[in-house]
Amino acid sequence: FRRNPIIGTKFTIAISSAKGGVGKSTFASNLALALKKMDLNVGLLDADIYGPSLPKLFSINEKPESDGQKLKPILKYGIQCMSIGFLTEEQTPMIWRGPMVISAIKTFTQKVLWENLDFLIVDMPPGTGDTQLTFAQEINMDGVIIISTPQEIALQDVKRGIRMFDKLKVKILGLIDNMSHFIGDDGKKYAIFGEG
């Protein structure tokens, strides 16, 4: 594959999960905020075309401006942000086939004016479909962090996701076992979803 860097970025890190509802978008947002707190220039790209969450997570209601050729990311908390959710109405379903999704991803990676980013954090959609393949084959990603929960069914899907990224030669930077337990008022640890 001929992978191209995203112009205006030094490092591109994808946050991925094979299943929805595991905390991937929350982790991606918190990672972006943590990197910003370290005085780094950070961008956050919500690549979940069918279920964008960045507008809600960052309370962004405005539309991005354009310089005539490229979209300008919306700046929130000092982070450059872009999402399909900024370009559509909240209640509008995205009834798109693969080629339209790929076109949207290419717009976000080639036609957004990312400026002097140390890190671009990409919040991927759940699964192993067109979006993941497009990013892995066409974008120079520095690595992926995979988010899961301890349930057996989620872990089976994670294994598939790991195999996909391995085949596409994308470095796996880490695996987060999210929602693995909580500490109750009694000080005891409870693994409500089982042990992963």
Descriptions of predicted regions:
Residues 24:
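Conserved lysine of the Walker
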Residues 88-135:
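Phosphate-binding/switch loop-helix module in NTP-utilizing enzymes
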Residues 118-119, 125-196:
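Conserved catalytic-core segment of NTP-binding enzymes
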